[in-house]
């Protein structure tokens, strides 16, 4: 927000090569204001969904509000876009109009610049094969959650601009720790019973909840019962009934 972005920028050192900032919004113009402060060389739009939708008439208005960061990316800079997203073409056109280079990532869209080719289970872990530009690269990851794979693809798209990703260690994403409340797994004890808890309580919107349920479905539990505890989904405004 208007406090977090300046604080993050002030925390950067003149010796830092890169700065990574998250730009949030719940109304039109907020990303425009913040991205004008940042003047990013590279921008990333992960996806468009009904998060913080209370101040928008429809999801296209959300997509247009997110696109404000593209307009404020430096000329000849880069925008990283999800080719599987419904508004990919819209954002791509805006980038072209503003002389911004586009790098796409995806799982379903096989024309993506950075795309998932295959995923193979190896014991309790997974090997993902990624195609980026004209080469393939494999990485080991600890789970096959779709949102996690999308994040990896987006990160690789960013890194491919300045880094030779073929030289990355195959375990570079393996030990990534999920932030608390965003799908982290812990073991708790209630009434002397051990319970495996997957915590997704940080925030909720239709897409993140769908991802959480799909991820939970992948967790095998033959000996134990599985429960899904759902709380309120806020900031949807008139879209709540939908």
Predicted features, each with a name:
Residues 18-22, 34, 39-46:
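AMP-binding/adenylate-forming
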Residues 1-15:
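Active-site phosphate/ATP/adenylate-binding loop shared across adenylate-forming ligases
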Residues 179, 201-242:
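Active-site beta-alpha connecting loops in nucleotide-dependent enzymes
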Residues 17-31, 197-203:
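Switch II (G3) loop of P-loop NTPases
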Residues 30-33, 90-94, 211-215:
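A short acidic, amphipathic alpha-helical/loop segment
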Residues 41-196, 221-224:
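Acidic, Mg2+-coordinating active-site environments of NTP-dependent enzymes
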Residues 11-15, 26, 36-37, 71-74:
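Conserved catalytic network of the ASCE P-loop NTPase/AAA+ motor domain
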Residues 1-3, 23, 47:
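Short beta-strand-centered segment that lines the nucleotide-binding/catalytic pocket of NTP-utilizing
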């Amino acid at each position: 927000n208007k406090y977090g972005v300046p604080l993050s920028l002030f925390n950067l050192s003149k010796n830092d090569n890169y700065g990574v900032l998250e730009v949030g919004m719940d109304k039109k113009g907020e990303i425009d204001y913040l991205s004008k402060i940042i003047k990013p060389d590279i921008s990333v739009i992960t996806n468009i969904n009904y998060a913080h939708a209370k101040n928008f008439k429809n999801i296209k208005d959300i997509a247009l509000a997110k696109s404000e960061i593209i307009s404020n990316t430096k000329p000849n800079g880069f925008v990283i876009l999800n080719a599987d997203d419904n508004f990919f073409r819209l954002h791509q056109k805006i980038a072209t109009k503003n002389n911004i280079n586009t790098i796409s990532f995806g799982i379903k869209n096989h024309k993506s610049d950075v795309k998932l080719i295959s995923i193979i289970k190896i014991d309790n872990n997974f090997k993902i094969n990624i195609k980026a530009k004209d080469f393939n690269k494999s990485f080991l990851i600890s789970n096959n959650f779709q949102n996690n794979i999308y994040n990896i693809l987006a990160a690789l798209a960013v890194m491919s601009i300045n880094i030779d990703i073929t030289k990355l260690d195959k375990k570079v994403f393996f030990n990534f720790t999920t932030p608390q409340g965003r799908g982290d797994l812990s073991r708790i004890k209630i009434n002397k019973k051990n319970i495996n808890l997957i915590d997704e309580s940080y925030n909720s919107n239709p897409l993140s909840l769908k991802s959480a349920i799909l991820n939970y479905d992948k967790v095998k539990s033959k000996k134990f019962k599985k429960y899904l505890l759902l709380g309120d989904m806020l900031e949807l405004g008139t879209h709540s009934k939908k």
